[in-house]
């Protein structure tokens, strides 16, 4: 019911905040995947090249996904 949705929303907001505040991390492999990360200094989703492994949660395949999760 309502209580579960409230708890679920709380955890989603905590996860969302943590992901969006993580720094850009290209990873340690040498692939070249175009991705987007949320730049907390500018408040915008910015393109970068992801190496394919490692990295963190602030790594989105599309601009739309970055904006939707980080509310940019």
Swiss-Prot record:
Disulfide bonds join 20-70, 29-53, 45-66. The record marks 30-31 as: Reactive bond for trypsin. It comes from the Eukaryota. Pfam families: Kunitz_BPTI (PF00014). It is found in: Secreted; Nematocyst. Residues 10-17 form a propeptide. InterPro entries: Kunitz_BPTI, Kunitz_BPTI_sf, Prtase_inh_Kunz-CS, TFPI/VKTCI-like. Residues 20-70 form the BPTI/Kunitz inhibitor domain. Keywords: Cleavage on pair of basic residues, Disulfide bond, Ion channel impairing toxin, Nematocyst, Protease inhibitor, Secreted, Serine protease inhibitor, Signal, Toxin. Its main location: secreted. Thermostable. Optimum temperature is 25 degrees Celsius. The ability to inhibit trypsin slowly decreases as the temperature increases to 7% inhibition at 100 degrees Celsius. The record marks 61 as: Important for the stabilization when complexed with trypsin. Residues 1-9 form the signal peptide. GO terms for molecular function: ion channel regulator activity; serine-type endopeptidase inhibitor activity; toxin activity. One of its GO terms (cellular component) is nematocyst. Belongs to the venom Kunitz-type family. Sea anemone type 2 potassium channel toxin subfamily. Negative results: does not show activity on all potassium channel tested (Kv1.1/KCNA1, Kv1.2/KCNA2, Kv1.3/KCNA3, Kv1.4/KCNA4, Kv1.5/KCNA5, Kv1.6/KCNA8, Shaker IR, and Kv11.1/KCNH2/ERG1). Does not exert any effects on TRPV1 channels. Serine protease inhibitor that acts on trypsin (Ki=190 nM) and to elastase. Does not bind to alpha-chymotrypsin, cathepsin G, and kallikrein. It significantly increases neuroblastoma cell viability in an in vitro neurotoxicity model, being a consequence of an effective decrease of reactive oxygen species (ROS) level in the cells. It also protects cells by inhibiting ATP-induced purinoceptor activation. Its binding affinity to P2RX7 is moderate (Kd=45.5 uM). This is PI-stichotoxin-Hcr2j.
């Amino acid at each position: 019911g309502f209580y579960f949705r409230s708890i679920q929303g709380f955890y989603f907001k905590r996860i969302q905040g943590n992901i969006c505040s993580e720094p850009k991390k290209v990873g340690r492999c040498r692939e070249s995947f175009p991705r987007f990360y949320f730049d907390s200094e500018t408040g915008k989703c910015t393109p970068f090249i992801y190496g394919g492994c490692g990295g963190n949660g602030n790594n989105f395949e599309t601009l739309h996904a970055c904006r939707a999760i980080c509310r940019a």
